[in-house]
Design a protein with these regions (language model features):
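A residue-level marker of the well-folded mature domains of exported/periplasmic proteins
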Residues: 1-5, 9-172
Length: 172
């Protein structure tokens, strides 16, 4: 492109500028991708997955809890060169504790070192999985401590987001 001052110098295209910026700020050569731009599964050379996500009820791309958690898992795995995969318990919204455990077991059997489980409904299955697979680390999203050293609970005060959203709306 010609520059706006018509000095005859050419300007770099946006793509070239983005590439140069990525090379300068990203020594690993990775672009700063949004989670939605990252593939849904990435295997390691041995075909195993280091990080697994077991969904809560509903679909993976529910534009809510599962999707937000999954996008965070993908982004972390991508940024840290980890392989990853998601598992949905059988029977969808009617999933039982056995269905949830079987999804966690499938993830552990596939080589997952970290399994992220979303939703408080995972607790019973997670207790069984944590005991069955003590070498696997579990992240319990929307859960409370359940007494296992290999389980890291992450809970949040859901009402706070509604309060803050309301406050932000009034302030605008």
């Amino acid at each position: 492109k010609k520059d706006p001052a018509n000095t005859g110098d050419t300007q770099k295209t946006e793509d070239t500028q983005k590439t140069e910026k990525t090379e300068q700020t990203d020594p690993a050569g990775k672009a700063d991708l949004a989670a939605g731009d990252i593939a849904d599964n990435m295997t390691s050379a041995d075909g195993k997955y280091e990080i697994a996500f077991v969904t809560d009820v509903g679909s993976l791309k529910d534009q809510s809890f599962n999707q937000g958690t999954w996008e965070g898992v993908k982004k972390y795995a991508y940024d840290n060169d980890k392989s990853y995969k998601y598992y949905q318990p059988a029977n969808g919204d009617k999933a039982t504790d056995d269905d949830r455990f079987n999804a966690m077991k499938a993830a552990a059997d596939a080589g997952a070192k970290i399994i992220v489980c979303a939703g408080f409904l995972q607790e019973t299955a997670l207790r069984k999985a944590a005991e069955t697979f003590p070498e696997v680390k579990f992240v319990f999203i929307d859960g409370y401590p359940i007494g296992f050293k290999n389980v890291a609970p992450i809970s949040f005060q859901e009402e706070q987001s509604g309060y803050l959203a309301g406050y932000a709306a009034v302030k605008e």
